[in-house]
C-alpha cells in the first residue's frame, strides 16, 4: 500500500513538507465479526482536497466515517488502529465524539436540510454549540462561502425544503461551514444532482479547498480527477473464507494516480478495465 506522505515513501512529496491534518495508523473497521476494511495507513494533507475512489464495497465511506466517529452510531461497529487528528487519537476514551464532529463536519450523499427555514438550518449548529457572536453575520458568511447567499438572501425565512436539490446540497455545505470546522468530509455529494448542480458543487469545492481540508468519496473518477489534489484508491480482496473486505491499494497525488500509478490494480481501475 503506497502513501506519498508516509515516512518511508521516498516520494518527492516528502521534500515539500506538507502539513498533515489527519493520519490513520493500521485502521481497521469491523461490523460485528465481519472485517469491513483492513489496516489503512495514510496521511491526509492539510488544506488540500483528497478523493477516495474505488468499486462499491471497498470501504471508502467506512473509512470516511471514521474521521468524525460516525461509525460509533452503527450498532456492532468497532475500530482498531488509530485516527490521529492534531496529535491526538480521536478514539481515545477521553475524547468527546461531539467535539470531533464539530471540528470535522460531514456532508451526506443526499441533501438533508432540516424542515426549518433556510436561516434556522444555518443557525442550528452554532446555537446548540453556544455561539455568542452575531448569528445574522455568521449565517450570511456561511451562505456566501457556499455561493448561495445571492440566491436566498431575500427568502431566509422560507422553508429549506423549497430549494432545488443543488441549492439544498449547498445549504448543507453552508450548514457545515457555520460550525467552523477544520475538516469537511463529503460522501458522494453530487450523486443525486444534475450535471449543472454538480458543476457548481465542484467549483465550490475548489474554492473551499484553499481554506479547508476536504475529503471526498466519489464513484465518479472524472470528478476525482477534476477537483482533488490527492487520491486514495481502495479495492476489495477475498479472505480465506471467501468473504470480501476493503483495503487501500495506493495513495498519491491525483495526477500520479491517474497518469502513472505505481500499482497495476490502480492502473486497471482508472483505465476502466475493471470496476
UniProtKB/Swiss-Prot annotation:
Enzyme class: translocase
Protein source organism: Synechococcus sp. (strain JA-3-3Ab)
GO BP annotations listed: phosphate ion transmembrane transport
Self-association state and partner proteins as the record states: The complex is composed of two ATP-binding proteins (PstB), two transmembrane proteins (PstC and PstA) and a solute-binding protein (PstS).
Identification of the protein by name: Phosphate import ATP-binding protein PstB 1
Subcellular location: Cell inner membrane
Keywords: ATP-binding, Cell inner membrane, Cell membrane, Membrane, Nucleotide-binding, Phosphate transport, Translocase, Transport
Known role: Part of the ABC transporter complex PstSACB involved in phosphate import. Responsible for energy coupling to the transport system.
Reactions catalysed, as given in the entry: phosphate(out) + ATP + H2O = ADP + 2 phosphate(in) + H(+)
First-listed, main subcellular location of the protein, grouped into a coarse class: membrane
Residue intervals of the ABC transporter domain: 22-261
InterPro entries in alphabetical order: AAA+_ATPase (IPR003593), ABC_transporter-like_ATP-bd (IPR003439), ABC_transporter-like_CS (IPR017871), P-loop_NTPase (IPR027417), PstB-like (IPR005670)
Keyword Hydrolase: no
Family: Belongs to the ABC transporter superfamily. Phosphate importer (TC 3.A.1.7) family.
Pfam families from the UniProt entry: ABC_tran (PF00005)
Residues the entry annotates as binding ATP: 54-61
Domain of life: Bacteria
Keyword Transport: yes
Database matches in PANTHER family: ABC TRANSPORTER I FAMILY MEMBER 17
Lineage: Bacteria, Bacillati, Cyanobacteriota, Cyanophyceae, Synechococcales
